[in-house]
Amino acid sequence: MTNFEPKKLKNIWTIEDSISTYNIDKWGDKYFSINSKGNISVTKDIKSENKIDLFKLVKELKSREINPPLIIRFNDILKDRINALHDSFFKAIKTYKYKNIYQGVFPVKCNQQKNVLEKIIEFGSQWNFGLEVGSKSELLIGLALLENQNSLLICNGYKDKKYIEIATLARKLGKNPIIVIEQRDEVKRIIQAVQELNATPLIGIRAKLSSKSSGRWGKSIGDNSKFGLSIPEIMLTIKELKEANLINEMKLLHFHIGSQISDIAVIKDALQEASQIYVELCKLGAPMQYIDVGGGLGIDFDGTKTSSNTSTNYSLQNYANDVIATIKDSCELNNIKHPIIISESGRAIISHCSVLIFNVLGTSHVSSKLQIFDKKNQQLIISNLLETFYELKKLKNKKINLSQIIELWNDAKKFKEDCLVAFRLGFLSLAERAYAEELTWACAKEISKNLNNDAINHPDLSEITETLASTYYANLSIFKSIPDSWAINQIFPIVPIHRHLEEPFCKGNFADLTCDSDGKLNNFIDDGKIKSLLNLHKPEEDKDYLIGIFMTGAYQEALGNLHNLFGSTNVVHIDINQDNSYKVKNIIKEDSKSEILQLLDYSSASLVESIRINTESAIDQKKLTIEEARKLMDQIEISLRKSSYLSE
């Protein structure tokens, strides 16, 4: 096997090294970088030089008692994403001489927070940007927030009689709801509502496409997809709308090919099929005006620009070009007027603006020191393990033969296994077993210190890195703040927000606060590759080590749950000023323990009273003094008002 030079440490760690290690310049989309102080910086928009220091911001928020874990939302980035989406479509419309407009909507399910939706409507108002809703509750939000009478309100999801009645009558308020038929029985309900209410809604149809999708949400398309009408069902629906004299209200064709589509070829295939369906609907006599291409516009979480589940092999402009060009070609071939194009791009709009910040509470790692052990009474199997360790130490600063290293490591593993067998049979003491494990770790450390990355990643040695990895204990709940990481193994960019002038020598992963073995983060973006460990710094005593999880704006807050009763974190909305300062626009305080318990039907007052009765009983039995009881009750009442997360 190949001989390797001994591992050499880098003399100076630079900002460029950190940018490369964490791939920030690739996934950051120019919104995130590292400043001269070694801290993460946040840019106002991709064309701006206005930046703020994220680490400084978090420290100053702490001085206001807004502590991690917290979500920081940058309004300027949200605005820039909306601008970028519209700019891309406007450029495509101009390039391809498309004879109509783009008019987008934001899917409320991506982030239902009131402050978020208000900002989206504000930033998109110049383009009549609307909302897409998928339930009666979301419909009520849309009707309340959308005041622009030119904005669209796309009504998707399952629809009962009340849903259809509300959407139908809302048209008389000057709103623009379009009821999208996704199930056959909705046709009958719409006809019934028209007859009973003396009002007519705008109508759309969602088509089930036969085009094949890809990625995690590939089953959103095809004959067995959850929503939409098959082609025979569409034909029957058109017939029934004509018979009910409602065909003139049929305005929109909608399709959806899934979320986070990574391959542009999938989008092109779906567009070609849907465009032809649109053309045929026009030929059947429906006065069509809109084609809603749904969601699916992906973002590049890992920065690789590939067709992997966590990336995309296309840009925002590529996407807009293909949408415009494909629809135009189909319409012009059939002498059909170009429709208004709608998209429901949620993730691409909302993801970048949110950063989840948490602090590290502590770490655990393999022992760095060997115990002093009595060699006279040492068992042979332990002596063999110790001899292997000494053989590895002799290789320090020498040219290393990889086959020799692999042989010694295999010996160490075998001797350790022999020790475990001996312990189970009662031939080794607990202290001897501990010494054997420490010797094995010491062997792994000697190999790690001497081999470069290429060698240590050899299949026969790769487990060494895992063996030596540290666990960093994170002050957050994965199930509450980033549930997609647990549920679907979604990978988010995770980066320390400071100390980037120092080399991150440690390899580690994160464990959250919950009592659940799934509460771990162990998939990371490392130099453009997905790895199980992240380069991290050793936390400094009495100093915060702050980590950022980026691109978390879509779905996470809506999907988060109360596992172990960890509640919502602090949320702060920030505006970046022209002078590189910032303004705190909104603060949404975290859930207190009392508020969380109330959600589950517990009365804080009743709980306190129940515990107080127990303390009185303990006082009577001389188990507790009055002073101890008072202190306990004070702590409980204070705790109920405080965060569910750990504090200093």
Swiss-Prot record:
The PTM N6-(pyridoxal phosphate)lysine maps to K109
Under InterPro entries, the record lists: Ala_racemase/Decarboxylase_C, Arg_decarb_HB, Arg_decarbox_C, Arg_decrbxlase, De-COase2_CS, De-COase2_N, De-COase2_pyr-phos_BS, Orn/DAP/Arg_de-COase
- The chain's disulfide connectivity reads none
Q: Which GO terms describe its molecular function?
A: arginine decarboxylase activity; metal ion binding
- Membrane-crossing residues? none
- The lineage's top-level taxon is Bacteria
The cofactors it requires, by name, are: Mg(2+); pyridoxal 5'-phosphate
User: Any idea which positions bind substrate?
Assistant: I291, D292, V293, G294, G295, G296, L297, G298, I299, D300, F301
Per UniProt, the keywords (alphabetical) are: Decarboxylase, Lyase, Magnesium, Metal-binding, Polyamine biosynthesis, Pyridoxal phosphate, Spermidine biosynthesis
Q: What GO biological process terms are annotated to this protein in UniProt?
A: arginine catabolic process; spermidine biosynthetic process
Q: Which family does it belong to?
A: Belongs to the Orn/Lys/Arg decarboxylase class-II family. SpeA subfamily.
Alphabetical list of NCBIfam families matching this protein: PRK05354.1 (NF003763), speA (TIGR01273)
Q: What is this protein called?
A: Biosynthetic arginine decarboxylase
Taxonomy, top ranks, is:
Bacteria, Bacillati, Cyanobacteriota, Cyanophyceae, Synechococcales
